[in-house]
UniProtKB/Swiss-Prot annotation:
Residues the record lists as binding ATP: 14-19, 71
Oligomeric and partner information: Homotetramer.
Organism encoding this protein: Variovorax paradoxus (strain S110)
Descriptive protein name: CTP synthase
Family membership noted in the UniProt record: Belongs to the CTP synthase family.
Encoding gene, per UniProt annotation: pyrG
Residues at which CTP binds: 13, 151-153, 191-196, 227
Enzyme nomenclature, EC number: 6.3.4.2
Residues reported to bind L-glutamine: 356, 384-387, 407, 473
Domain Glutamine amidotransferase type-1: 295-547
Function description: Catalyzes the ATP-dependent amination of UTP to CTP with either L-glutamine or ammonia as the source of nitrogen. Regulates intracellular CTP levels through interactions with the four ribonucleotide triphosphates.
Source taxonomy: Bacteria, Pseudomonadati, Pseudomonadota, Betaproteobacteria, Burkholderiales
Record-listed Mg(2+) binding positions: 71, 144
Disulfide bond residue pairs: none
């Protein structure tokens, strides 16, 4: 029978519930348990697909094509279970489902209310996410409830998990609550009152926390933990200190050493072998002992919020670890780059242009791609980054001076990038769209496979077939591919059905490392293996740094 751990948060948002949940899952998995995680988001949007990155951060895409919360990226990087559409749902999805049932007459004329209809539907979604009765069923499902206790948006979710815990009976569920313990510099002490109040508010809803994770900028002394225990009705061993660390990969060891996993296993009556966290210790050692440093210029549109590129940041750091190097990322707003000052990118060892939507800042990205191509600086373009590299090449090499994307100029005479009108989705169904289609849920999403041409840089990285996750509406226009090929651009991967362009590159006798990919490889990177594309990109950056230093000896790098 699947056991459940419900993770809630109090006082303020952004405490790190996602990292805490993923870390607990990682420890339980190291004990031999099959674990999954589910994220409940209390906003009314159906999914985060149409939300601004400044509002929500990155949209993480699963293999089956779900646009989800960025916490699912943490989940996949910390445990081996792959996330699915069922692992993330929102208030919008719940209400949409309930209203559809009401319209069909499924409720047999009853008055549809938050309790029981909304709360029952939430419980059904949680069970679906845990894979109950299917091949995806797990030993433990950790359910992270977004928002903060006390928010009106979260109340139906908290009521639903309270009911669910009651129905499952004792020892089948546990509650973990994150709180904030601020350090007041003027007083020179930690203040526990906010944590006392959030635990009290949780009890008023009918939920008693089994463990309190107390977030602070420093370890919490034993006397303060005892005080929190007394006023929150949580045993002292259940008051866990969770202080700031320089890498998130230290959190599993931190929580384990304070006995969180043992407490949860005792509460759920689960007998397991001891936790094995050696690989986490080795990972932290690799983070803390780089042999060299490499600097990457990330030229993007959403650089004011690093969470907009969360998986990308992690993928670069993973690749750095595989190459025994610290990766220093400088975020550069593409709106600030012009052909006149693009040379300021010369100090970097490589240039990366990530995905994005809309016209703002596009010309700056095109200038960055041109600088990388002409200066022989390693370049990786992802999604829009591939498209701007294609536009740049068409304008300045292929002679198509007015080349553009119909996303930025619908009337362009040379639409080298255009809207995809038909494609096969991750589940094999054929999808169509046009300029008047809704924005939400109409992109090419999820894992897609492509054939890779032999003898190319892409083939040396991926082999014969590449399968990666996608999230885009626009694609290289097949009507211009022959002209681009004739001008020297290598189209090294095409989809197997529609022959859509997936990878473009320059011959290695023309440029040492220049590649654009239509997909999002960052979603499949892990701290254990990195990702072959990013591993190769960071190695190319290290090689470029060595060449720029006049042939200085390069330390061994592994791609």
């Amino acid at each position: 029978m699947t056991k459940f751990v419900f993770v809630t948060g109090g006082v303020v948002s952004s405490l790190g519930k996602g990292i805490a949940s993923a870390s607990l899952a990682a420890i339980l998995e190291s004990r031999g348990l099959k674990v999954t995680l589910i994220k409940l988001d209390p906003y009314i949007n159906v999914d985060p697909g149409t939300m601004s990155p400044f509002q929500h951060g990155e949209v993480f895409v699963t293999d089956d094509g779900a646009e989800t919360d960025l916490d699912l990226g943490h989940y996949e990087r910390f445990i081996t279970t792959r996330m699915r559409k069922a692992n993330n749902f929102t208030t919008g999805q719940i209400y949409k489902t309930v209203l559809e049932k009401e319209r069909r007459g499924d409720y047999l004329g009853k008055t549809v209310q938050v309790i029981p209809h909304i709360t029952n539907e939430i419980q059904e979604y949680i069970k679906r996410g845990a894979g109950l009765g299917t091949a995806h069923e797990v030993d433990v499902a950790i359910v992270e409830i977004g928002g903060t206790v006390g928010d009106i948006e979260s109340l139906p979710f908290l009521e639903a998990v309270r009911q669910m815990s009651l129905r499952m009976g004792p020892n089948n569920s546990a509650f973990v609550h994150l709180s904030y313990v601020p350090w007041i510099a003027a007083a020179g002490e930690l203040k526990t009152k906010p944590t006392q109040h959030t635990a009290k508010e949780l009890r008023a809803i009918g939920i008693q926390a089994d463990a309190l994770l107390c977030r602070a900028d420093r370890p919490i002394p034993d006397d303060e933990r005892a005080k929190i225990s007394l006023f929150s009705n949580v045993p002292e061993w259940g008051v866990i200190s969770m202080w700031d660390v320089d890498t998130i990969y230290k959190v599993p060891r931190m929580l384990h050493e304070q006995g969180l996993d043992g407490l949860i296993c005792d509460k759920l009556r689960i007998n397991t072998p001891p936790a094995k966290l050696q690989r986490w210790d080795e990972l932290v050692y690799e983070v803390e002992h780089p042999q060299q440093e490499v600097s990457i210029a990330m030229v993007g549109k959403y650089v004011d919020l690093s969470d907009s590129y969360k998986s990308l940041n992690e993928a670069l750091r993973h690749a750095g670890m595989k190459n025994h190097a610290r990766v220093k990322i400088d975020y550069i707003d593409s709106e600030t780059i012009s052909p006149q000052d693009v040379s300021r990118l010369a100090k970097y060892d490589a240039i990366l242009v990530p995905g994005g939507f809309g016209q703002r800042g596009v010309e700056g990205k095109i200038s960055a791609a041109r600088f990388a191509r002409e200066g022989k600086v390693p370049y990786l373009g992802i999604c829009l980054g591939m498209q701007v590299a294609t536009i740049e090449y068409a304008r300045h090499v292929a002679g198509l001076k007015n080349a553009n994307s119909t996303e930025f100029d619908p009337e362009t005479p040379c639409p080298v990038i255009a809207l995809i009108t038909e494609w096969k989705d991750a589940d094999g169904t054929v999808k169509t769209r046009n300029e008047k289609s809704d924005l939400g849920g109409t992109m090419r999403l999820g894992a897609q496979s492509s054939d890779v041409s032999a003898g190319t840089l892409a083939h040396s990285i991926y082999g014969d077939v590449v399968t990666e996750r996608h999230r885009h509406r626009y694609e290289a226009n097949v009507n211009y591919l022959d002209e681009l090929r004739a001008a020297g651009l290598v189209i090294s991967a095409l989809t197997q059905r529609e022959h859509l362009t997936e990878i473009v590159e320059l011959p290695q006798d023309v440029h040492p490392w220049f590649m654009g990919v239509q997909f999002h490889p960052e979603f499949k990177s892990t701290p254990w293996s990195g990702h072959p594309l990013f591993n190769a990109f960071i190695k190319a950056a290290l090689d470029h740094k060595a060449r720029s230093a006049g042939g200085a000896k390069n330390l061994k790098a592994v791609a």
